[in-house]
Amino acid sequence: MHNIRRYILLMTTFALTLATMAQERVVQNKPFIDERPWHYGFHIGLHDQSLKLINNGFVDPATGAQWMAENDRQNFGFSVGILGDWRITRQVALRVSPGLHFGSKHIGFRNQADGARRSQDLKTTYVAVPVDLKIAAPRFNNYRPYLVGGFSAMYDMTNAKGEMLRTKALQTFVQIGMGCDFYLPFFKLNPELKFYFGLGDVLLHQRAELTNPEQQIFTQSLSKANSGMVVLTFYFE
């Protein structure tokens, strides 16, 4: 939650800066680009993955071990993809922006019984297909702020077996965000900050590949896990 407040403060400062700049009109770059019904482009960005883990206090009856797990650090990664944008009205557009998210989630484990520690770097390569509704303000000079929200399906291609924890390969998210269109002389640049909230439990509870009880205890110690992500994206149209 602290990180989300920091990201929102950053975007608020950015919006106030734009308002300060909007004191007089200037010559518009690419004045007719928004009249086209279809827009295409690509996007690159950075993201911070998170995994909210719910511990259940399970105690191993054989050893007395009680492991607690948490996503104990920020996990920055890289994103890249393409986009297609369909203008519905002058202020509303439907956008599809399939892409790849390369990242990881660092999980720390602590045994409450003896203080022992373990860790896991849960690597992910998501193939993502987000569908968003983009609602934009009227254009002023060479920028145009907007809000965006929608739904995304992601498939993790690096879901390796044998790890202490595994998450489901297919995950779904709802997302909301904000951004701004900047009209440059030769293209349109859209920096955007978006928050992804995972739907449902993504922890893989049935681990038939684990035959050692010492490996199974990490999954048994968790009730559920929820994915999340904060993505800073730069769209080029």
Enumerate the language-model features and the residues they cover.
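Residues that define the transmembrane beta-barrel architecture of outer-membrane proteins
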Residues: R36-W38, Q74-F78, K123-V129, Y143, ...
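Flexible, solvent-exposed loop segments that connect beta-strands
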Residues: I54-N71, G103-T124, M157-T167, L203-L222
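Short glycine/proline- and aromatic-enriched beta-strand/turn motifs that initiate or cap beta-hairpins
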Residues: Q23-F76, Y235-E237
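Residues on the lipid-exposed face of transmembrane beta-strands in outer-membrane beta-barrel proteins
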Residues: F42-L46, F78-W86, P98-L100, V129-A137, ...
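Predominantly the C-terminal beta-signal and adjacent terminal strand-loop region
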Residues: V27, A169, Y183-E237
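Repeated loop/turn-to-beta-strand initiation elements of outer-membrane beta-barrel proteins
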Residues: S50, Q91-L94, N141, F186-L189
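Cleavable N-terminal export/targeting peptides
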Residues: M1-D34, E237
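Structural signature of outer-membrane beta-barrel domains
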Residues: H47-L51, H101-K105, S152-T158, Y196-V202
